[in-house]
Amino acid sequence: MTQKHILSGDLLVFHDDPFEVPPEDAVQIQSDAALLIENGKITARDSRDILIAAHPEAAHHPHPNRLICPGFIDAHVHYPQTAMIASWGKRLIDWLNTYTFPEEMRFDHPAYAAEISARYLDLTAAHGTTTMAS
């Protein structure tokens, strides 16, 4: 059975690259808009009223006066270093030897690796990051 949800509010929509064209041509805020989410994937974007009328079986999650944005992309991550965020070192080699290498050696234990990866994913999702590359 398909699970359908409608998430409504003001949508931030990119039509083009804001570094290539004037920002006013690249980005738009659509008021009273909505996203249709089916089985966890966005399948449609339209006005709130149109999507609700077309999908009366969908659960509606209104977010008036809220801006719904695309997820952030982090193109370079070091998830094994999650437990040592903000650790201090005088020089890079000191920092690597004192914090990074010992911490990354702990990932030899699957339970520890699973714990830190879950913490990392929770932190990134809580801050709006939906895509990461290492």
How would you label these PLM feature ranges?
Residues 86-134:
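Alpha-helical scaffold segments that flank or form the walls of functional sites
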Residues 27, 40-46, 56-60, 84-90, ...:
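Short, exposed beta-strand "edge-strand" segments with a Pro/Gly-rich flavor and a Y/T-containing core
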Residues 20-22, 57-60, 75, 97-99, ...:
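Surface-exposed beta-strand edges and their flanking turn/coil or helix-capping segments
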Residues 1-54, 66-67:
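N-terminal metal-binding scaffold of metallo-dependent hydrolase/deaminase domains
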Residues 13, 20, 30-31, 80, ...:
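Generic, ordered loop/turn and secondary-structure boundary motif
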Residues 44, 63, 72, 81, ...:
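Structured catalytic/translocation cores of nucleotide/phosphate-coupled proteins
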